């Protein structure tokens, strides 16, 4: 017999109603007679087991078998009543805007909320540049810059669903670096614009805010492991993947360490207890502000400028003109012009960096290692870099567990032909080859479509790849032979923190449907 209900709870409820209906029908015939005669071939009332009902349709409260509806209306009503009461609304939408350091991105998610956990059915994604932080004091301009993304949301979310589709704007490292006063004005203008000019309810409290680094990393971990099916699924607890995210202003690490019986994670801000579905997870997470890709570039270039100031090649305070300096993080014959370098003193110098006569990849790696401040005092061993405690990945994270590296890790490797899975040593080889320059490029990358154009149009590849190797190997202590996975999507869904941050918004705990004006 085809299954009647979506799950056994529907079956129990509906079966009770069916039996009540049959009992009422039977009682209306009158008390049974001892000498009651049954006429041959007479129509005998059917029991529920005799009735064949097709599965309930995807729409709650809809019965596919029209014959059953006609002949047994009470039974059909019972089925529809049970499904409707349990799940009155299948599809819900959530709008999440990621206001990053280099640009803003909108993710519009469509969920089936009749499953546990909710099933992600579809995602609409779009992005634009520049980021909110580039507007500096123009807070209204910053708010209006999101209009193209919100137009995408207006076109995607059905009209009837808009008033109950929450929207949140989460800014990351770029806006943090702008300072409290400027960032607060921008966020206030964004909230005001959303509330006045759009039909979507804005999430209360921290719905429009600068996201804490711990949240950013943990939400990315949730997204990744949710899409991989590692969390939220029925059955035994599964091993989870580690997540390393590299943005423009910061980098995050999140993983679930396992300790020997007599050990446990050291308490501190790095420890994050998470409940997802029926399982509890104790995660290590940390957001290294100032160690995103673009901040890493600036740190390396700052070392070169500071050295030039010490050597008298640049006079302190002489920042009204463009200076020329050689950089080991450029391949031979490659220049990086008009680079703005901001020192710790907040002084900014404009530099034209010139590539050396000979490849200097080793010297570049020395610089990218140096900025990690690996020798900083470690008050709670073991530490990764800059004095930050981190459980050893070698000791507490099995080699069979996946490591995923996202965002700029993907953006700087994929255009050069790297696969979606490679060892850290292979990434190290790529950095070494890129830093050698044009002659080597022509022999190595000629068969990879578009890669030579990428290298010739962007002078930062040598520095960026060297920094990534330093960050993963010297910083996080990942062995060179360890396999890494990367990508922009899992199961055709965008990777990042946004999905993980959107899942809690399916419960209207901190937002209310907007009242539609007449």
Curated annotation (Swiss-Prot):
Residues 1-9 are cytoplasmic. The keyword Ribosomal protein does not apply. Residues 25-518 are lumenal. It is found in: Golgi apparatus membrane. It holds the Pfam family GDA1_CD39. Present with 8680 molecules/cell in log phase SD medium. This is Guanosine-diphosphatase. GO terms for biological process: nucleoside diphosphate catabolic process; protein glycosylation; protein N-linked glycosylation. Pathway: Protein modification; protein glycosylation. Belongs to the GDA1/CD39 NTPase family. The lineage of its organism: Eukaryota, Fungi, Dikarya, Ascomycota, Saccharomycotina. Its main location: Golgi. InterPro entries: GDA1_CD39_NTPase (IPR000407). The active site is at 216 (proton acceptor). It is a single-pass type II membrane protein. Its EC number is 3.6.1.42. It catalyses: GDP + H2O = GMP + phosphate + H(+). After transfer of sugars to endogenous macromolecular acceptors, the enzyme converts nucleoside diphosphates to nucleoside monophosphates which in turn exit the Golgi lumen in a coupled antiporter reaction, allowing entry of additional nucleotide sugar from the cytosol. Keywords: Glycoprotein, Golgi apparatus, Hydrolase, Membrane, Signal-anchor, Transmembrane, Transmembrane helix. PANTHER family: ADENOSINE/GUANOSINE DIPHOSPHATASE (PTHR11782), GUANOSINE-DIPHOSPHATASE (PTHR11782:SF83). Homodimer. The chain crosses the membrane at residues 10-24. It comes from Saccharomyces cerevisiae (strain ATCC 204508 / S288c) (Baker's yeast). Glycans are attached at residues 41, 280, 335. GO terms for molecular function: GDP phosphatase activity; ribonucleoside triphosphate phosphatase activity; UDP phosphatase activity.
């Amino acid at each position: 017999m085809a299954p009647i209900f979506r799950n056994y709870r529907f079956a129990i409820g509906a079966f009770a109603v069916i039996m009540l209906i049959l009992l009422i029908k039977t009682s209306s015939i009158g008390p049974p007679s001892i000498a009651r005669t049954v006429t041959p071939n007479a129509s005998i009332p059917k029991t529920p087991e005799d009735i064949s009902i097709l599965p309930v349709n995807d729409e709650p409260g809809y019965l596919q078998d029209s014959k059953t509806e006609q002949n047994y209306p009470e039974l059909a009503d019972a089925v529809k009543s049970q499904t409707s009461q349990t799940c009155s609304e299948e599809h819900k939408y959530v709008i999440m805007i990621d206001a990053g350091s280099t640009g803003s991105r909108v993710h519009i998610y469509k969920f089936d909320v009749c499953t546990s956990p909710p099933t992600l059915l579809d995602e609409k994604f779009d992005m634009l540049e520049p980021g909110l932080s580039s507007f500096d004091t123009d807070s209204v301009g910053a708010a209006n810059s999101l209009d193209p993304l919100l137009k995408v949301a207006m076109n995607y979310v059905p009209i009837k669903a808009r008033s109950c589709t929450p929207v949140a704007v989460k800014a990351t490292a770029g806006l943090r670096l702008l300072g409290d006063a400027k960032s607060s004005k921008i966020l206030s203008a964004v909230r005001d614009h959303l509330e006045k000019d759009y039909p979507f309810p804005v999430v209360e409290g921290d719905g429009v805010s600068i996201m804490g680094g711990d949240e950013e990393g943990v939400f990315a971990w949730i997204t990744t492991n949710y899409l991989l099916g590692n969390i939220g699924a029925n059955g035994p607890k599964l091993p989870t993947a580690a997540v390393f995210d590299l943005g423009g202003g910061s980098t995050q690490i999140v993983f679930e360490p396992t300790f020997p019986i007599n050990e446990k994670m050291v308490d501190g801000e790095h420890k994050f207890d998470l409940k997802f579905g029926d399982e509890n997870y104790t995660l290590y997470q940390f957001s290294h502000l100032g160690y995103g890709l673009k901040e890493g570039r600036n740190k390396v270039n700052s070392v070169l400028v500071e050295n030039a100031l010490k050597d008298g090649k640049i006079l302190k305070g002489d920042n009204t003109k463009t200076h020329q300096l050689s950089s080991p993080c450029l391949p031979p014959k490659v220049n990086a012009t008009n680079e703005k370098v901001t020192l710790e003193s907040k002084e900014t110098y404009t530099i034209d960096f010139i590539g050396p006569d000979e490849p200097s990849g080793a010297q570049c790696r020395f610089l990218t290692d140096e900025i990690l401040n690996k020798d900083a005092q470690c008050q709670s061993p073991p530490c990764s870099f800059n004095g930050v405690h981190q459980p050893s990945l070698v000791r507490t994270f099995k080699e069979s567990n996946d490591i995923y590296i996202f965002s700029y890790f993907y953006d700087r490797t994929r255009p050069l032909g790297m696969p979606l899975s490679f060892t850290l040593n292979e990434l190290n080889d790529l950095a070494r080859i890129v830093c050698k320059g044009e002659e080597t490029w022509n022999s190595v990358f000629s068969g990879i479509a578009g890669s030579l154009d990428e290298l010739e149009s962007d002078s930062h590849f040598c520095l960026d790849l060297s920094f990534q190797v330093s960050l993963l190997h010297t910083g996080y202590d990942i062995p060179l032979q360890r396999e890494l996975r990367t990508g922009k999507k899992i199961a055709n869904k965008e990777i990042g923190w946004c999905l993980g941050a959107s899942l809690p918004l399916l419960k209207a705990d901190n937002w209310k449907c907007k009242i539609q004006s007449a």
